[in-house]
Amino acid sequence: MTKAPIAGNRTGRKLGQRVKNKKMKASSRQWLQRHINDPYVQRAQLEGYRARAAFKLLEIDEKHHILRGAKRIIDLGAAPGSWSQIAAKVTGSTDEDIRVAAIDFLEMAQLPGVKILQLDFLDPTAPEKLLEAVGGTPDLVISDMAAPTTGHHRTDHLRTMHLCEVAAQFAVEVLGEGGHFLTKTFQGGTERELLAMLKQNFRQVVHVKPNASRAESVEMFLLAKGFKGRKVEGDAEKA
């Protein structure tokens, strides 16, 4: 996730205002103007969320109810922390009773009730550290991870899909029965193996593109609901 201010409109500009800076490149000026005029950016600042991405999760939850009843949540690719803010609120997580663990290789400002790990999720030690940090079996694993873009669509898609696959495997290994998994992906085809694995392990698998995702963006989300649980060794042998 792209880093953003913690809260407040630090631009001092009103919605619809143009950006004037002769030294700034046209592309940068265009991006900044779009950012300033984005209604979700304005809402995030007004409501105290660290990023507009908060409304993607809230919109998905409004339709699919993945946050309801969640007691422990793991947030992958968490910076700057808007999803973790929501997770801490719905779980009632506090510094004395941590119920949310967040991980990102980017630095992330501290959040009440959230254990933050500044670490690459692909690090072999990450899964164990996340489980230890969250203090129990998670009901929900959410991932807004995306590989740094190269400008080559196919390469970017493949690199992000790899993160999706690793996150999905992690979710299957740690979720409690009935838990849910949400991950960012890019339009351009979800790998068959990933979909097959999710459908084998979850009761429902759907693609979602919330309104808060920019219309021109190839971003969408893959939601797997109702984890079926892990087979014990004896069950696998009988099958």
Swiss-Prot record:
The keyword ATP-binding does not apply. The keyword S-adenosyl-L-methionine applies. Residues 1-20 are annotated as: Disordered. S-adenosyl-L-methionine binds at G81, W83, D104, D120, D144. GO terms for cellular component: cytoplasm. The active site is at K184 (proton acceptor). GO terms for molecular function: rRNA (uridine-2'-O-)-methyltransferase activity. It comes from the Bacteria. It is found in: Cytoplasm. Specifically methylates the uridine in position 2552 of 23S rRNA at the 2'-O position of the ribose in the fully assembled 50S ribosomal subunit. This is Ribosomal RNA large subunit methyltransferase E. It comes from Rhizobium leguminosarum bv. trifolii (strain WSM2304).
